[in-house]
C-alpha cells in the first residue's frame, strides 16, 4: 500500500485475537510499525490459543496439536491447509506464511487482513478467526474452514454439469454478500475493494461468507484514496482512470459484475488484451446489461433491476447498501423461509460436489 494506507492502518488498528476478555492482546500497531523486522511482526500475531465461536473454552495449542490433511489452496502471502485440531476434532483452515517471503508492503496487507477478520467476530457472513501460532519459521493463522469458492462452484455447475444456479440461490448469495459488505462499512469503516466470485466462499451447509481482506481500504469520511488495489476485471470505471477518492459504490459495481457472472455463468465482458482495451470497454463503453430473457433463460424483473442498478456507470447514481437493501430482490431473500432453506441445500450439495471434483477452469 502507499504511505496513506500505512498511516490509516496505524491510526485505526489495534490487533487483538478478539474482543473477548479471555484473549490476550497480541499486537498494537503504532508509528514504529515500519521498523519491525518481518519475523517480529508475524510473531506478534501469535495468540498461542484457539477459540471457537460455539465453545467457551480457550485451547492452548502448538503445531503438534494440528493434523495436516493437505493443502487446499493458495491465499495472500501463503498456502492454506485443511487441518484437524486433535483435541476437539474440529476441522479448520490454516494459512502458513513464510517469514522470509514477506516484505513491508505484504506486512501491511497481512496486518490489515488479520485485523479485519479479528474485528469481524460478530459480523454476519464473514470468515471467522480462531487463533494463531508461530512455528517452524512460519506464522500459522487458523480460520474457519469453508468448502469452495463461488468462482469454482458456478463454473462447475454451468460448464461441467451444463446446469444453472436458480434464482433462489443467487438471491441467498446476494443477501449474504451485501450484509457482509455493509457490516464492513458501518462497523469497521472499511470497504473491501476486491469483491469477486473467488472471494465468496461456501460450505456444505449452504453458508456464504466473504473472505480476503488484505487490501481493504480504510474510509476517511466515507471515501478511500488508493487506486492500486483490487482485481482488474471487477474494478468500477472510476477506479480505473480517476485519481479521485471513491467509496462503497465501487464495491457495488464489483458486486454487480460478480452477480451477473454467477446468475448467467459467464463474465459480462469479452476478454481484454490490454489495459487500453479495458479502458475502452469499461470506461468509455456502455455498462453490461442483464435482460429478462438473456440466453434463452428468463430472469425475474427484481433480479434484473438489482444487477443492472449495481452496474450504473455513473457513480453518483449508483446505490449504496441501504438503498440496495430496499430493493425487492434483496427483501425477498432477506427473510428466512422455504426458498432460502432450499437455496442453502442446493448450495451445500454443489459446494461438496465441487470440492470433491476439482477441475481447472482457467482459460
Curated annotation (Swiss-Prot):
Pfam families: Pkinase (PF00069). Keywords: ATP-binding, Cytoplasm, Kinase, Nucleotide-binding, Serine/threonine-protein kinase, Transferase. Residues 66-330 form the Protein kinase domain. The keyword Nucleotide-binding applies. SUPFAM superfamilies: Protein kinase-like (PK-like). It catalyses: L-seryl-[protein] + ATP = O-phospho-L-seryl-[protein] + ADP + H(+); L-threonyl-[protein] + ATP = O-phospho-L-threonyl-[protein] + ADP + H(+); L-tyrosyl-[protein] + ATP = O-phospho-L-tyrosyl-[protein] + ADP + H(+). Residues 14-28 have a biased composition (Low complexity). It is found in: Cytoplasm. Expressed in the pharynx, including the corpus, isthmus and terminal bulb. GO terms for cellular component: cytoplasm. GO terms for molecular function: ATP binding; MAP kinase kinase activity; mitogen-activated protein kinase kinase kinase binding; protein serine kinase activity; protein serine/threonine kinase activity; protein tyrosine kinase activity. Residues 1-38 are annotated as: Disordered. Activity is required in presynaptic neurons, in a dose-dependent manner, for normal presynaptic development and morphology. Plays a role in the formation of muscle connections, also called muscle arm extensions, between the body wall and the motor axons in the dorsal and ventral cord. This is MAP kinase kinase mkk-4. It comes from Caenorhabditis elegans. The gene is mkk-4.
Amino acid at each position: 500500500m502507499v504511505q496513506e494506507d500505512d498511516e490509516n492502518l496505524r491510526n485505526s488498528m489495534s490487533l487483538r485475537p478478539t474482543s473477548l476478555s479471555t484473549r490476550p492482546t497480541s499486537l498494537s500497531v503504532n508509528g514504529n510499525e515500519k521498523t519491525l523486522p518481518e519475523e517480529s511482526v508475524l510473531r506478534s500475531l501469535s495468540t498461542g490459543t484457539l477459540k471457537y465461536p460455539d465453545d467457551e473454552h480457550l485451547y492452548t495449542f502448538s503445531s503438534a496439536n494440528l493434523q495436516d490433511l493437505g493443502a487446499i489452496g493458495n491465499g495472500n502471502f501463503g498456502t492454506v491447509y485443511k487441518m484437524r485440531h486433535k483435541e476437539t476434532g474440529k476441522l479448520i483452515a490454516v494459512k502458513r506464511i513464510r517469514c522470509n517471503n514477506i516484505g513491508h508492503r505484504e506486512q501491511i496487507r497481512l496486518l490489515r487482513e488479520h485485523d479485519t477478520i479479528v474485528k469481524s467476530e460478530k459480523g454476519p457472513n464473514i470468515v471467522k478467526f480462531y487463533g494463531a501460532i508461530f512455528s517452524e519459521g512460519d506464522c500459522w493463522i487458523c480460520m474457519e474452514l469453508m468448502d469452495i469458492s463461488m468462482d469454482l462452484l458456478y463454473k462447475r455447475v454451468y460448464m461441467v454439469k451444463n446446469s444453472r444456479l436458480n434464482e433462489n440461490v443467487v438471491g441467498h448469495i446476494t443477501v449474504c454478500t451485501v450484509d457482509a459488505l455493509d457490516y464492513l462499512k458501518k462497523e469497521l469503516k472499511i470497504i473491501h475493494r476486491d469483491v469477486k466470485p473467488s472471494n465468496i466462499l461456501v460450505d456444505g451447509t449452504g453458508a456464504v461468507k466473504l473472505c480476503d481482506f488484505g487490501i481493504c481500504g480504510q474510509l476517511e469520511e466515507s471515501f478511500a484514496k488508493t487506486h492500486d488495489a483490487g482485481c482488474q476485471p471487477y474494478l468500477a470505471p472510476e477506479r480505473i482512470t480517476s485519481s479521485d477518492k471513491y467509496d462503497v459504490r465501487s464495491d457495488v459495481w464489483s458486486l454487480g459484475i460478480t452477480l451477473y457472472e454467477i446468475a448467467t455463468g459467464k463474465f459480462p465482458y469479452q476478454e481484454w488484451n490490454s489495459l487500453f482495451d479495458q479502458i475502452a470497454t469499461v470506461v468509455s463503453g456502455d455498462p453490461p446489461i442483464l435482460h429478462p430473457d438473456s440466453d434463452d433463460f428468463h430472469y425475474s424483473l427484481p433480479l434484473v433491476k438489482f444487477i443492472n442498478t449495481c452496474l450504473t456507470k455513473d457513480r453518483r447514481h449508483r446505490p449504496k447498501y441501504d438503498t440496495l437493501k430496499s430493493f425487492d430482490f434483496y427483501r425477498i431473500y432477506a427473510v428466512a423461509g422455504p426458498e432460502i432453506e432450499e437455496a442453502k441445500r442446493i448450495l451445500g450439495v454443489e459446494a461438496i460436489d465441487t470440492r470433491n471434483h476439482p477441475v481447472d477452469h482457467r482459460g
